[in-house]
C-alpha cells in the first residue's frame, strides 16, 4: 500500500540549502515555516523557524513562534531541540540519542522519558514521516503513534506550477486521544523530488502548509 521507499538520507539534501513553506488558514496567508540545511563531512543539521499568527477583528487569537535544530550523524538522529511560544505559553523539547541503550532520551514540556529509535521528529521537511508508525512532537516531545494511508495519485496546482503528486492521510492510531491532540493530516507528496509539498488539516477552520521555495 505504501509507495514510498526512497529513503531520505542527508545526501538527498546535499544540494539543497533551504526550503520555505507558507502557512494559510482558510486560504489566508498567516505565516511561514522555513528549514535550513547544513551538511558537513560527518553531520547533517536542519534548523527551523516557524512563525504565524491568526487575527480576528485585528486581535491576535492564536500565534506560534518556534525555533528548532535537528542533528543527524550517519543518518541517525543524535540531537533535537526546539523552543516554542504558543499564545504566550512556552513549550520545549530536547531529544538525545542514547547509544548505549539504543533509544532516545526525551525531555519535553508534555513528555519526559524514553522513545524507541523508530520515532521521527514530526517536521514537514522529512518525508520519512510517511514511512513511520510513530513520531515525536517537534513542539512538546509527546510520542504519537500514527498510521499512513495512500489515497491516490493526482495532479495539483501549487503556486504557478502543476505537479504530479501522491496523496496520503496521516492520522493518530490512538482513538482515545482528545480530538485536538490527534494527528489528522492530508499530505501531498512529490515523489520526483522526494518532498512533501502540501499539508492540510482542520482545526477551527482549514489550515494548509504549502511548499513555496526550494533553494
Predicted regions and their residues:
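Short, small-residue-biased leader/transition segments that mark boundaries at the very start
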Residues: 1-4
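Hydrophobic, well-structured mid-protein blocks that either form specific transmembrane helices
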Residues: 82-122
Amino acid at each position: 500500500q505504501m509507495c514510498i521507499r526512497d529513503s531520505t538520507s542527508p545526501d538527498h539534501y546535499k544540494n539543497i540549502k533551504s526550503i520555505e513553506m507558507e502557512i494559510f488558514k482558510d486560504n489566508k496567508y498567516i505565516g511561514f515555516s522555513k528549514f535550513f540545511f547544513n551538511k558537513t563531512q560527518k553531520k547533517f543539521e536542519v534548523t527551523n523557524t516557524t512563525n504565524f499568527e491568526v487575527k480576528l477583528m485585528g486581535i491576535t487569537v492564536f500565534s506560534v513562534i518556534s525555533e528548532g535544530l535537528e542533528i543527524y550523524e550517519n543518518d541517525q538522529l543524535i540531537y533535537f531541540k526546539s523552543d516554542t511560544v504558543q499564545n504566550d505559553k512556552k513549550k520545549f523539547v530536547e531529544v538525545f540519542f542514547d547509544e548505549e541503550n539504543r533509544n532516545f532520551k526525551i525531555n519535553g514540556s508534555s513528555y519526559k522519558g524514553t522513545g524507541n529509535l523508530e520515532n521521527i521528529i514530526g517536521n514537514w521537511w522529512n518525508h520519512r514521516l510517511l514511512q513511520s508508525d510513530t513520531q515525536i512532537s517537534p513542539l512538546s516531545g509527546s510520542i504519537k503513534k500514527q498510521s499512513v494511508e495512500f489515497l491516490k495519485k493526482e495532479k495539483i496546482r501549487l503556486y504557478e506550477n502543476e505537479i504530479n503528486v501522491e496523496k496520503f492521510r496521516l492520522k493518530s492510531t490512538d482513538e482515545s486521544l482528545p480530538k485536538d491532540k490527534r494527528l489528522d493530516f492530508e499530505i501531498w507528496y512529490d515523489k520526483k523530488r522526494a518532498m512533501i509539498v502540501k499539508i492540510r488539516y482542520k482545526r477551527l477552520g482549514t489550515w494548509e502548509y504549502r511548499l513555496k521555495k526550494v533553494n
